[in-house]
């Protein structure tokens, strides 16, 4: 792209860009059309005309005095305006994605992508981008990345308080290329290099524990997760499962469609989750109860279990389908929708708050466990898991009780 421009060109294009943003967002691709019929900001304090006029003044001054005018990148300037518009809303979940970020975002829900094979989350206390899971035999594992690593830099990009989706877009890239990842581990800064590869996301793992208690771990709710979960559930049933543990610890969430379809394999007839938008309109997602799971069940959660994980745990808790074991979850009780902007970019916007079957809002609160147990690391036995032990004990107790009552 040619960056050098004639006098006044930058001012004209930027003013036009902002006017387009203020007049409305035309969202195509089968989503919805949003337009501004009021002609001003919702507050009524700042009009389009005032903003456009001030921007004209800023651009006139930049055109007249800015030393590096020939280096102005109008495309980057435009992207900055779009990003700034959403950032100024003060909602960390409403985000504008440029073309590269949109491509990476779409890949992240497909079940396969070119990357390093690690799951990231935002630490609930520090807001740092943190690795919570490293896929087995992945480039991330081969590079030495570990769960708990705090991301500081991706190549030359400072991570800081960047949106998680942006950080992920930096990590992903063409198969066979290297990415330099700088992490903080136990107070020590480490610079590691991973070679990107095609990652087939295994979001579900499972095994039969002692006393015929099935264990299913779900790392995230992607497009591929439903089939993997159903396969695990069916196989454990064939093995004679007497009770079940679903482990959602460190699961940051994912697709609403995926989690509700999974819950249809477990819940009785009724509401799975309901949402309420800005106008008070309520929508319900329901279950017909055809596949209700009636055996003892526990769901493991922690402070990193968020979004779709909280829909799952909140629903099974409300119906009494499972006991929730662990600590209070993250507390993300709002729904976002991806909206195609028609030019390879997209907008992720918060459109509703969701409620559990009993009408509970968990936004900013989280799902509280029925059996609270903090994870305790055992230096002598690093593989020990006191939270899992408690879940096993909880399910076993219910199995024993149901056997006695027969």
Where are these regions (language model features)?
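Intrinsically disordered, Ser/Thr/Pro/Gly-rich linkers and terminal tails that flank
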Residues: 1-122, 163-208, 220, 230, ...
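Cleft-lining beta-strand/loop regions that shape enzyme active-site pockets
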Residues: 2-5, 132, 141-143, 147, ...
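Conserved P-loop NTPase
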Residues: 336-341, 347-378
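Short, well-ordered strand-loop elements centered on a beta-strand within folded domains, enriched
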Residues: 126-135, 188-193, 273, 346-349, ...
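A residue-level signal for beta-strand positions that form part of recognition/binding surfaces
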Residues: 115-117, 128, 178, 191, ...
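PDZ/PDZ-like domain segments forming the peptide/carboxylate-binding groove
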Residues: 16, 20, 44, 48, ...
């Amino acid at each position: 792209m040619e960056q050098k421009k004639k006098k006044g060109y930058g001012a004209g294009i930027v003013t036009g860009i902002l006017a387009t943003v203020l007049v409305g967002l035309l969202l195509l691709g089968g989503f919805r059309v949003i337009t501004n019929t009021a002609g001003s900001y919702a507050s009524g304090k700042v009009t389009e005309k005032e903003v456009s006029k001030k921007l004209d003044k800023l651009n006139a001054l930049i055109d007249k005095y800015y030393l590096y005018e020939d280096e102005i990148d109008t495309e980057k300037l435009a992207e900055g305006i779009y990003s700034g518009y959403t950032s100024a809303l003060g909602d960390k979940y409403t985000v504008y994605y440029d073309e590269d970020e949109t491509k990476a975002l779409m890949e992240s829900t497909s079940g396969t992508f070119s990357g390093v094979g690690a799951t990231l989350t935002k630490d609930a206390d520090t807001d740092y981008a943190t690795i919570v899971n490293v896929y087995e035999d992945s480039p991330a594992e081969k590079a030495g990345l570990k769960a708990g690593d705090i991301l500081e830099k991706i190549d030359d990009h400072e991570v800081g308080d960047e949106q998680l989706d942006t950080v992920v877009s930096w990590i992903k890239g063409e198969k066979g290329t290297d990415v330099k990842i700088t992490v903080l581990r136990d107070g020590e800064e480490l610079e590691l290099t991973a070679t990107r590869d095609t990652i087939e996301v295994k979001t579900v793992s499972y095994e039969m524990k002692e006393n015929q208690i099935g264990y299913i771990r779900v790392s995230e709710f992607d497009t591929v997760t439903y089939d993997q979960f159903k396969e695990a559930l069916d196989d454990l049933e064939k093995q004679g499962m007497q009770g079940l543990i679903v482990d959602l610890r460190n699961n940051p969430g994912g697709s609403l469609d995926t989690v509700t379809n999974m819950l249809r394999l477990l819940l009785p007839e009724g509401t799975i989750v309901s949402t309420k938008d800005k106008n008070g309109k309520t929508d319900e997602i329901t279950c017909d109860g055809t596949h209700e799971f009636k055996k003892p069940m526990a769901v493991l959660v922690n402070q990193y279990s968020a979004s779709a994980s909280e829909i799952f745990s909140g629903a099974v808790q409300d119906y009494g389908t499972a006991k929730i074991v662990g600590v209070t979850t993250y507390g993300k009780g709002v729904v976002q929708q991806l909206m195609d902007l028609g030019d390879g970019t997209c907008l992720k916007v918060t459109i509703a708050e969701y409620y559990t079957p009993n009408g509970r809002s968990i936004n900013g609160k989280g799902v509280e466990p029925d059996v609270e147990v903090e994870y305790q690391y055992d230096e002598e036995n690093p593989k020990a898991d006191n939270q899992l032990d408690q879940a096993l004990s909880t399910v076993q107790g219910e199995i024993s009780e149901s056997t006695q009552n027969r």
